């Protein structure tokens, strides 16, 4: 028979000592070691009524979605010219890359780059044209002239020529790359105002070698070296200079149609495939002579130098926006950034749907660039890869002087984390876009158009 003491220790209930009723109850006493109910500290409960969620507390609410850069197409053997009727200057030679910047689930911007030297955005109000199997040209409005830029002061136009178009002529050594050109044209259809315009057969026959497309078409990227490269480059320069009046005329008319929302361009209405005889004579003469450095310098018109400066600004602007997005400086969500929504951007912005390119207009791209530049004008750094010596060797001192003006054509990168941090402070990610702001801007735009 068990003793009464054994019954007490095996009891399910704690033993209460009644010998001293005024003594405090000790919750940690040995009598409660077998208690089925857990002990609770009321102080802990009071302090942790709303515990933090560890999986979300470390992420700030205003953090922008991650941005990534994707190379969706790469074509070797690309030569890029600045189309000019006095002398088309070669800007870059190397690989053509089409780069897509994605932030979250949205395609924020699509950029074209040649040899990592010249970049420009592909946008829905930018004209891209296929002329033949190896030649394409792109039309861009140059960025807003900056009043404090020394190159503007030397221009003497006070920024009045900011609406003058930049026309880039792209030549591709297309032998063996025909399938890549098909992909390129699909991308241009998706992200720009793409059309196909051809030179008339009469002009091709009269132009002899100057408009001959077989030189580039029958050259592969591997063969684009040495003497063969010089032949192709000379032919490309003559080709684009000969077609310059046609390209400039078409670009001006096409830009007006795109700005008014006229949609796709109809072949034959704007493009004049016939090349004037004086242009053909000039082009054929150019093909027959080899220009020395001094002769090249004499061919560069002062207006061409101004356009070269605008090319540099276009590259700077494109890299500024791209690096700002990738650095988390610029958060894009929904349709547009607030810097775009708060300006008079025009009705074409508001016809876009979610999922399309957010920076779908070059106007929008320019305004985003302005916001980035204001925030980080004094902290951004420049990295140069195109040297004055190279340009001086190819095009003479005047072109080299233009290349040395302002920021270099090849470099405008943020580069360091502290720079990105400073600009992130200046542009508040919380105020990226308010739907009410977008709606009010759309209403004001529609009202102004109705009054007009």
Swiss-Prot record:
Q: Per the record, GO CC terms?
A: chloroplast; plasma membrane
* Name of encoding gene: ERD7
UniProt keyword list: Chloroplast, Plastid, Transit peptide
Q: Where is the Senescence domain?
A: 258-426
Annotated Low complexity bias: 19-37
> Could you tell me which species this protein originates from?
Arabidopsis thaliana
* Biological process terms in GO annotation: circadian rhythm; response to abscisic acid; response to cold; response to high light intensity; response to salt stress; response to water deprivation
- What ranges does the record give for the region Disordered, renumbered to this chain? 1-37
Location, primary (coarse class): plastid
Biased composition annotated in UniProt, kind: Polar residues: 1-18
Annotated compartments: Plastid, Chloroplast
Q: What induces it?
A: Diurnally oscillating levels. Induced by abscisic acid (ABA). Regulated indirectly by CAMTA1, probably via a DREB/ERF pathway. Accumulates during dehydration stress.
Give the range of the organelle targeting sequence.
1-28
Q: What protein is this chain from?
A: Protein EARLY-RESPONSIVE TO DEHYDRATION 7, chloroplastic
Q: Which domain of life is it from?
A: Eukaryota
